[in-house]
Amino acid sequence: MIIKRREYMRIADYSVTKAVLDRHGFTFKKSFGQNFLTDTNILQKIVDTAEIDQNVNVIEIGPGIGALTEFLAENAAEVMAFEIDDRLVPILADTLRDFDNVQVVNQDILKADLQTQIKQFKNPDLPIKVVANLPYYITTPILMHLIESKIPFQEFVVMMQREVADRISAEPNTKAYGSLSIAVQYYMTAKVAFIVPRTVFVPAPNVDSAILKMVRRDQPLIEVKDEDFFFRVSRLSFVHRRKTLWNNLTSHFGKSEDIKAKLEKGLALADIKPSIRGEALSIQDFGKLADALKEVGL
């Protein structure tokens, strides 16, 4: 039986967090990027943003001592929380002892066999959402690992460094726009839901965070001939942001007369000026460019 605890002190209440850490003699490891949230209003806002209810399973990454997990467990059908730090497993067993709908998996999410793990949900056919406070140092690898997996996650509501959230959700012709924006938005819509100040964490990080909501598209935003080549072209177009598209392309593909002739032909086919910068191209433009370059033999 799940015990609802809305009327009690929360794990995220500062006094409770401190008591839990003291009781277990826990010390933070910088290598794991550990910053524990101590604001219950923000935690409730995260759950509301993710629209968690009893018809949804949740995957959480980096539960810490269970502050967000507690809120998720009260609302979701089931929560599967991946925690890489062995020391936190007994703490989570303590703080979440009143919930029978939480599974703590002591494993690196990047190494987990997610296809097998999600079958461990009591009702694996329910939609799955990812809700997490992601470690700053490994945010992008985790996101891309999950997005590119064959698991149909319905949406992601994740906390990350504000700068990274801005880059992911950025539009063309902005300073934040780049290959990361394209890589995520190809698969998902992305929007910053709200900002989280650094002052509500223990220990406090050096920068503010943001909650990013990403919803999986039914189909990728565009259709391309070769996805790997499309992502490769988008990445190389931002290697030197101040350089023109032509300079970035020739730096990568080469500057022989044959290569330059193919690049000129490909750019003409895509109706893209060589003098433009990558940040001015939409995802659709990059799709046309990649297909055209593929067509001319690059």
Curated annotation (Swiss-Prot):
GO terms under cellular component: cytosol
Keyword terms, alphabetized: Cytoplasm, Methyltransferase, RNA-binding, rRNA processing, S-adenosyl-L-methionine, Transferase
Q: Which Pfam families match?
A: RrnaAD
- Primary residence: cytoplasm
Q: What is its EC number?
A: 2.1.1.182
Where found? Cytoplasm
Q: Which reaction does it catalyse?
A: adenosine(1518)/adenosine(1519) in 16S rRNA + 4 S-adenosyl-L-methionine = N(6)-dimethyladenosine(1518)/N(6)-dimethyladenosine(1519) in 16S rRNA + 4 S-adenosyl-L-homocysteine + 4 H(+)
Q: Which domain of life is it from?
A: Bacteria
SMART domains to which the protein is assigned, alphabetical: rADc
Q: Where does S-adenosyl-L-methionine bind?
A: 35, 37, 62, 83, 108, 133
Q: Which GO terms describe its molecular function?
A: 16S rRNA (adenine(1518)-N(6)/adenine(1519)-N(6))-dimethyltransferase activity; RNA binding
Q: What does this protein do?
A: Specifically dimethylates two adjacent adenosines (A1518 and A1519) in the loop of a conserved hairpin near the 3'-end of 16S rRNA in the 30S particle. May play a critical role in biogenesis of 30S subunits.
Q: Name the family.
A: Belongs to the class I-like SAM-binding methyltransferase superfamily. rRNA adenine N(6)-methyltransferase family. RsmA subfamily.
HAMAP family (UniProt xref): 16SrRNA_methyltr_A
The protein's name is Ribosomal RNA small subunit methyltransferase A
Gene of origin?
A: rsmA
